[in-house]
């Protein structure tokens, strides 16, 4: 099932953990609508900006899958409202800064950020619905959450260093 021009449902439901443990990871119609909203409001604009394919590393998670990986059943992933992703060759911090400045989102987290490894970690972004997004921005280093994104040096719209 095609969710948007560049994204298919399978990209959001595939899970090695679900496969290994025999967990059904199938979203309902409301979850699928939410995934489409994430595509249109977050992923398609990001893909257009950076002109590169996006790799979805985690999308929809059933409650059983959330439990199996130690995530909360109330996670926005369980509602189809969140996505974790990367863009090969683009520092995750650059993607996060662009989303913060240009997209309507509920929560944006630069996950497992390491300033010495710009390709490390990933971007988590969620979308709730127009008018109810919190615009919460966090950085997670693997131990604790900090408000906002790290300060970076920029030149010509690119992260320096």
Residue spans of the language-model regions?
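Extracytoplasmic cell-surface/polysaccharide-interacting catalytic and binding patches
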Residues: 1-47, 142-161
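Extended, low-complexity, intrinsically disordered C-terminal regulatory tails
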Residues: 44-71
């Amino acid at each position: 099932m095609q969710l948007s021009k560049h994204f298919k449902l399978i990209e959001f439901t595939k899970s090695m953990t679900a496969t290994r443990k025999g967990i059904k990871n199938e979203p309902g119609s409301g979850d699928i609508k939410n995934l489409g909203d994430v595509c249109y409001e977050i992923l398609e604009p990001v893909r257009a900006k950076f002109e590169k394919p996006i790799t979805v590393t985690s999308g929809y998670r059933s409650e059983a899958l959330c439990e199996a990986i130690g995530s909360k059943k109330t996670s926005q992933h369980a509602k189809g409202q969140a996505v974790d992703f990367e863009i090969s060759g683009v520092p995750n911090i650059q993607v996060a800064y662009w989303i913060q400045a240009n997209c309507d989102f509920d929560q944006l987290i630069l996950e497992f950020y390491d300033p010495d490894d710009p390709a490390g970690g990933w971007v988590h972004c969620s979308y709730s619905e127009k008018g109810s997004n919190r615009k919460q921005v966090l950085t997670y280093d693997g131990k604790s959450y900090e408000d906002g994104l790290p300060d970076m040096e920029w030149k010509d719209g690119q992260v320096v260093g």
